[in-house]
């Protein structure tokens, strides 16, 4: 993987040199040529994102569906190998790629919005804040704590300082991030799963278990993965988020 990343980074550097070489020496404006295109892309995607975020997911009206269709159009134009290179590239290369593709720009903007909410939002007593994070992941913040479940994202490891524990329902790559898992282990924070470590690790749940982490009361059980023939593959989490949320219970079983 390191060799692949080095090759990708070298190709990115050569591409960047090509853009510089093609620049017009007599025109130093950052609003023309390649830079101008990037600025227009950012402005368009920012406007689309704000249209989505200013609407309610509970009300599916024409405005929201039109915005979602536009975002789907961004995704349809992104080649899978380009997205894979973005996910696996060095941080600097991936950050630069975000400026060149609308769906990747949106992908990062959505993550930054979630991070801002986790770090800065104040959760009132009797409530909980919930963010859906591409594509199976959730982050839940309460007045007294924060946890995440099934997070798979290029920048997932940035969540580690701000969450108290992480849950992973099963070993499918769209449900976990190795970088985030390792960051949590490095910080000495609990990672609940049925496969990451053997049963000597207290947070390995291969069946019915009960945990208390802060004000969170967690129950686990094991189940099969839909019709894929994977028996006892998925851990179901039932998480009582505490009295300061009105004993809100979050359940995740995907």
Predicted regions and their residues:
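Bacterial N-terminal signal peptides that target proteins for export
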Residues: 1-10
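Intrinsically disordered, low-complexity regions of eukaryotic proteins
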Residues: 4, 25-28, 212
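Bacterial N-terminal signal peptides
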Residues: 10-18
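Intrinsic structural disorder/low-complexity segments
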Residues: 11, 175, 253-254
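Bacterial Sec-dependent N-terminal signal peptides
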Residues: 18-40
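Core dinuclear metal-dependent hydrolase active-site scaffold
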Residues: 33-161, 202-254
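Active-site metal-binding motif and surrounding structural segment of the metallo-beta-lactamase
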Residues: 151-196
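Short gly/pro/ser/thr-enriched loop/turn and capping motifs at secondary-structure boundaries
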Residues: 198-200
């Amino acid at each position: 993987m390191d060799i692949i990343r080095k090759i990708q980074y070298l190709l990115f550097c050569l591409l960047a040199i090509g853009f510089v070489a093609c620049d017009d020496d007599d025109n130093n404006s950052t609003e023309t040529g390649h830079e101008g295109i990037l600025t227009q892309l950012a402005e368009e995607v920012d406007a689309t994102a704000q249209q989505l975020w200013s609407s309610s997911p509970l009300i599916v009206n024409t405005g929201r569906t039109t915005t979602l269709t536009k975002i789907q159009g961004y995704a349809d134009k992104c080649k899978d190998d380009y997205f894979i290179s973005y996910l696996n590239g060095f941080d600097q290369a991936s950050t630069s790629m975000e400026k060149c593709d609308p769906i990747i720009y949106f992908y990062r903007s959505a993550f930054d919005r979630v991070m801002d909410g986790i770090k800065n939002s104040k959760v009132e007593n009797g409530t909980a804040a919930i963010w859906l994070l591409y594509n199976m992941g959730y982050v839940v913040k309460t007045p007294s704590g924060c946890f995440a479940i099934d997070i798979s994202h290029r920048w997932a490891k940035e969540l580690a300082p701000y969450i108290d524990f992480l849950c992973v329902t099963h070993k499918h790559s769209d449900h976990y991030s190795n970088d985030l898992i390792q960051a949590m282990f490095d910080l000495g924070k609990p990672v609940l799963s049925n496969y990451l470590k053997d049963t000597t690790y207290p947070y390995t749940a291969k069946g019915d278990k009960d945990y208390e982490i802060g004000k969170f009361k967690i129950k686990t059980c094991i189940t099969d993965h839909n019709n894929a023939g994977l028996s006892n593959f998925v851990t179901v989490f039932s998480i009582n988020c505490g009295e300061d949320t009105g004993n809100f219970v979050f359940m995740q079983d995907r």
